[in-house]
């Protein structure tokens, strides 16, 4: 073995077996042409930016570049506030995952869908980094580089978005402050229409990288989480299940006369999949509960059942961050429940017993589902000889229904899901309605009960866990038979749908349509109003 470079090679060793295969006289250098662009790429240590020229030449809509203006907006209200960066362009946002940093300017194009019958101005300004934008007024924003835009402008307005920075390049993963494009309503929106009908002017923001925009430093391939674009199940509301009562959805409506901020505990879910209150994932759990039952006959009352609650999957219920086990009824009244019971009577081993259970809002039965204990009773002249054991109670009918939260902890405080809301002025909650079986000697109509989302939507969001990119999703509801667009609405991240409706009475929509996802929009996005002929013509597509 050779121990040093100075050691003489052995004549018959393994290292000498490959020597002198080519005579020295025949050896010559093989000419190699230089790689094209090697000199240009050398200072960047192999970091070559490959942005397609088409991306530099064409404007595309920004991911959050959709906004609207209506007479409800007040001067000084910010319509959009977007930062310079790859996130301003869908192509650059996709490419930025491969690079460590970016640098350079961008160009934006503002398109307003105005008409000759409206008047108003918006101001678009470039706000430098680290400037507090929360206190901007209409007077202060004109101190920055800005452009005044009339809503009657037909041609797109093009603006440069300069990269003002204090670093050599921006890291794609850091929230480094950069130049921001802020659009503010400068003067109120007015119309010469004799009526007071609400109207909306829509706007779009498009972007493209400037010629000096560039990415720097390729990142090594790493395992990343794949984020799905938010979508909705393609299912008509009439085929969905109600989220607060085990029945199909029979109606879709808005009604300004009903409470605008109900505090329902079932049918509540965030767009990111976070369940609120006592909302279950399975529709078979709605308004039901499981328990260990103990029966006792009381003279003058009948058979009294004491239910020690458990979760409906059989696991133990632990009081904590919700008011009751999952699926427990979230309304008040006298509920009739059916329980599969076992008796000691000969020839009557199994039977279905109907108990009456007072849910609230206040009771004398000391109902405390938060602590895992509720009571129910059935009128009987003698003991029913029921056998204690595990049961599952399902609702049958309701008497004295009240759409308020039941008694959860014998009058004491419990953790509750927050009320639904807030809404912008003119917005009304979209309600999914079904009807409960009711026992009443005076009113023969079934009792209506509403929910914020169908149970299929709740299960969809809970199982997909979408990534939230803004404060609301712009949706459109389309009739599947005629193809007509019935209304547009916003699905807020908190899990409720809002419409713009100026009427005073209820407005019902057909349940054979489907919801379509349009884009992410800010909370202040103004919706086109429904319920008027002119607006209906405007929404048709």
UniProtKB/Swiss-Prot annotation:
Residue numbers spanned by region P1 sub-domain 1: 225-277
Annotated spans, Protruding domain: 225-541
Keyword Translocase belongs to the record: no
Domain notes: The shell domain (S domain) contains elements essential for the formation of the icosahedron. The Protruding domain (P domain) is divided into sub-domains P1 and P2. P domain interacts in dimeric contacts that increase the stability of the capsid and form the protrusions on the virion. An hypervariable region in P2 is thought to play an important role in receptor binding and immune reactivity.
InterPro entries: Calicivirus_coat, Calicivirus_coat_C, Rhv-like, Viral_coat
UniProt main location, coarse: virion
Location(s), subcellular: Virion; Host cytoplasm
Any one GO cellular component localisation term in the record: virion component
Keyword Magnesium found: no
Quaternary structure (record): Homodimer. Homomultimer. Interacts with the minor capsid protein VP2. Interacts (via P2 subdomain) with host receptor CD300LF (via N-terminus); this interaction requires Mg(2+) and Ca(2+), and allows viral binding and entry into the host cell. Stochioimetry is 2:2. Bile acids interact with the P domain dimer interface and act as cofactors enhancing virus binding and infectivity. Interacts with host receptor CD300LD; this interaction allows viral binding and entry into the host cell.
Region of interest: Interaction with host receptor CD300LF: 298-366
Function: Capsid protein self assembles to form an icosahedral capsid with a T=3 symmetry, about 38 nm in diameter, and consisting of 180 capsid proteins. A smaller form of capsid with a diameter of 23 nm might be capsid proteins assembled as icosahedron with T=1 symmetry. The capsid encapsulates the genomic RNA and is decorated with VP2 proteins. Mediates virion attachment to the host cell receptor CD300LF.
Source taxon at top rank: Viruses
The family this protein is said to belong to: Belongs to the caliciviridae capsid protein family.
Region (P2 sub-domain): 278-416
Entry keyword set: Host cytoplasm, Virion
Chain intervals for the UniProt region annotation (P1 sub-domain 2): 417-541
Residue ranges of the region described as Shell domain: 1-224
Naturally occurring in which organism (per UniProt): Norovirus (isolate Mouse/NoV/United States/MNV1/2002/GV) (MNV-1)
Protein name stated in the entry: Capsid protein VP1
């Amino acid at each position: 073995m050779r121990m040093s470079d100075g050691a003489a090679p052995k004549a018959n060793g393994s290292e000498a077996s490959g020597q002198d295969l080519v005579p020295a006289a025949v050896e010559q250098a093989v000419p190699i042409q230089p790689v094209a662009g090697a000199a240009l790429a050398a200072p960047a240590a192999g970091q070559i930016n490959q942005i397609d020229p088409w991306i530099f030449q064409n404007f595309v809509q920004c991911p959050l570049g959709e906004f609207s203006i209506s007479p409800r907006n007040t001067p000084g209200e910010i319509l959009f506030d977007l930062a310079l960066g790859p996130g301003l362009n869908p192509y650059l946002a996709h490419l930025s995952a491969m690079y460590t940093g970016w640098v350079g300017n961008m160009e934006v194009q503002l398109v307003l869908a105005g008409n000759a019958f409206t008047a108003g101005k918006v101001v678009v300004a470039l706000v430098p980094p680290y400037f507090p934008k929360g206190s901007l007024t209409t007077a202060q924003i004109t101190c920055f580089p800005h452009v005044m835009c009339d809503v009657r402008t037909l041609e797109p307005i093009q603006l440069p978005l300069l990269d003002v920075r204090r670093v050599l390049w921006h890291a794609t993963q850091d929230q480094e402050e950069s130049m921001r494009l802020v659009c503010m309503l400068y003067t109120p929106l007015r119309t010469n229409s004799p009526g007071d009908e609400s109207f909306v002017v829509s706007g779009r923001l498009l972007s493209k990288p400037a010629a000096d925009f560039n990415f720097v430093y390729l990142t090594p391939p790493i395992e990343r989480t794949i984020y799905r674009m938010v979508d909705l199940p393609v299912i008509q509301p009439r085929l969905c299940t109600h989220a607060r009562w085990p029945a199909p959805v029979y109606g879709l409506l808005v009604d300004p006369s009903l409470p605008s901020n109900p505090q329902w505990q079932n049918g509540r879910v965030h767009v990111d999949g976070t369940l609120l209150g006592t909302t279950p994932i399975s529709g078979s759990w709605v308004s039901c509960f499981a328990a260990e039952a103990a029966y006792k006959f009381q003279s003058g009352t009948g058979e009294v059942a004491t239910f020690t609650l458990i979760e409906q999957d059989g696991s133990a219920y632990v009081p904590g961050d919700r008011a009751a086990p999952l699926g427990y009824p979230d309304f008040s009244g006298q509920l009739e429940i059916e329980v599969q019971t076992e008796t000691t009577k000969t020839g009557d081993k199994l039977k279905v017993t109907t108990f009456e259970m007072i849910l609230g809002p206040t009771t004398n039965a000391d109902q405390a589902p938060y602590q895992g204990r509720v009571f129910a009773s059935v009128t009987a002249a003698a003991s029913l000889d029921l056998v204690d054991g595990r049961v599952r109670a399902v609702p049958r009918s309701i008497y004295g229904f009240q759409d308020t939260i039941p008694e959860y902890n014998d009058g004491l405080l419990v953790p509750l899901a927050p009320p639904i809301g807030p809404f912008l002025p003119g917005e009304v909650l979209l309600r999914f309605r079904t009807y409960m079986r009711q026992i009443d000697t005076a009113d023969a109509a079934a009792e209506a009960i509403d929910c914020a989302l169908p149970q299929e939507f709740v299960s969809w969001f809970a199982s997909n866990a979408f990534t939230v990119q803004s404060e609301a999703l712009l949706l459109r509801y389309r009739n599947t038979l005629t193809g007509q667009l019935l209304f547009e609405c916003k699905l807020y991240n908190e899990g409720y749908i809002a419409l713009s409706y100026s009427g005073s009475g209820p407005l019902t929509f057909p349940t054979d349509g489907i919801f379509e996802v349009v884009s992410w929009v800010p909370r202040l996005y103004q919706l086109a109003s429904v319920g008027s002929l002119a607006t209906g013509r405007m929404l048709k597509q």
